[in-house]
Amino acid sequence: MKITENLGEFQKFIEDDSKTGLCLEDTLGFFDIQRIFGQFESIKQSGIRVTLILTTLLVMLFYRNRNIHSYFSRQHGKQMGREGSKNPYYDLLGNEHISWRSILYLFAKRYLNLSGRIAEYSGRIRALIFDDSPLEKSGKKIEAVSKMHDHVTGRFLLGFKILVCGYWDGNNFIPIDFSLHRERGSELDKARGKRNRARRKARLAEAVYREHRAQHLETRAVLNSLRDEMNVCSKKATALEYAKQEKRVSRSKKKQSRLRNRMKLAQAILEEKEEVVRRKEKKAPLYGLTPSQRRRQYRKNRDKTSPGYQRRLEADMSKTQSVINMLVRAVKRGFEFDYVLFDSWFFSKEILARIESFRTKGIKLIAMVKMGKNLYRDCLSSKDMDANTLRKQYRNKETRNRKFNARYIKVPVWYDNRRVNLFFVKLGSGSKWKAIITNDLELGFNKLMETYHIRWSCEVFFKDAKQHLQLGKCQCNNFDSQIGTITLAMMQYMMLLLYKQMHYGHSLGRIFDLISSQAEEENITRYLLELFWEIVNGIGEILKVDCMELFEEMIRDNQRAEEIMRLFSPVFEKKPAA
């Protein structure tokens, strides 16, 4: 029989409990909403108070209403005895002067304060985690929407990429910051880059040719002058000088011919690259949209001093710069953490330099890096080598680790004049070699892997928030509304975490009791993080596939997780008895 039941983190709270909405309203009271939302009361001069509107937007999802219209035309109408209006709520949601980033930071700080009173996590690893995920949209008129490449599925989607900065407090992942990005289109950008390089080469070749041609004309003028002088008086010295000058002119003429051919070749290459760009603009246009589609997109004139204007600028900012900005903001806001974790997509010299600047605060880096062409200076040989060359150089230093069924090689290197350690890791027999970099020089392999696994909690957040909290489902054309709805979804996520901690987890001594049979039935994702590693490793061994990639796929895909759960259900039934 096919299992159709959703096994996400918060399924029972949203659908099964008829009193959840009222209970969560009580939970919301602990967050001191009046203080957080009250600072924006001046935005509205009359009508419904800002605090009431934002509070309503926060709790309406828990009354089984998936959008503002359904809530205010049904639920609100039943309560008030008349039809409610959705307009003030949409207007406030799209207001550029609301600092959604400040609201999210204040809400997260309040959650950590409340959570710390219920359970103590001192001594556990705290981390800042960065990861991105696609948010698919259906309307091409949405402001700043673009075609983007989903590196997980390999498909091109219409929408945004959301880059999330999350905080791991020792037991839970909470989102504290984010930015929305659009993609210009890598194929077109590459073609334009090649065209621009060809254009520079063509201009340089033409400049060199013209400069030499001017020199050649001067050389010929000297030769003609000597010829005229010989016609007047035939001196031996003049004849010798004329012969030398004639050779100079001959060499100059040959060089001019070579430079002319080089210039023509550069111009031909430039024409070819320009033709490629023209074809790409038709096949893969800017942002994946035609010029007419881009013109029809929603546009809004914003106050340049408003938070909404700054958020809109972030859509075209590089993710590397966004990561740096979020990292700096988190430190300034008083978040304390030991490590910064992210995948190979975000690692760069600039990010490493910024993290190194926080060494006095004890902040260190653990990140996956690509086995590409980046050069590292070996500490022993002082030679510059790429990752693959380094791994082969130290293959005799390979060590076996039973806990993770892994082989690894630890290599001390310099990267961008900064001392770091490279760990080359191979899990099982089906995985490929991967490289993990850290500037924590005292970190051992076991702690490295345990800490890096925390990064997958961000994948859990994406899955649960998209499935249950409507993350990224807003289809408003206004970019400010997109930011607002995402912020509300993240706040709802923290509300549910606190609600679960207060009503379900504290009596058992933990927020989430992942080892119980209830967790097996209702919390497949978290259960995977804690107990499935050996099973995933076994599957990887049998199928000869990459264990880490399989693990991430199981987190993202409910159906695959359920199928694997059914296959191994006899094992789970025997395990408690053992």
For the regions a protein language model found, what residue spans apply to each?
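Domain-level cores of phosphate- or acyl-group-handling catalytic modules
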Residues: 208-278, 286-380
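A short, flexible helix-boundary coil/loop motif
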Residues: 1-48, 76-80, 182, 191, ...
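Short, conserved catalytic/metal-binding motifs centered on acidic residues
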Residues: 56, 71-73, 124-138, 165, ...
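Short amphipathic alpha-helical "interface-anchor" segments enriched in bulky aromatics
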Residues: 24, 128-134, 444-476
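Short helix-capping/linker segments at secondary-structure and domain boundaries
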Residues: 63-69, 169-175, 495-506
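Electropositive nucleic-acid engagement tracts
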Residues: 37, 43-48, 64-140, 146-147, ...
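Short, amphipathic alpha-helical "recognition" segments used to contact nucleic acids or chromatin
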Residues: 53-64
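Active-site-proximal, Lys/Arg-enriched surface segment
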Residues: 3-5, 16, 37-41, 94-207, ...
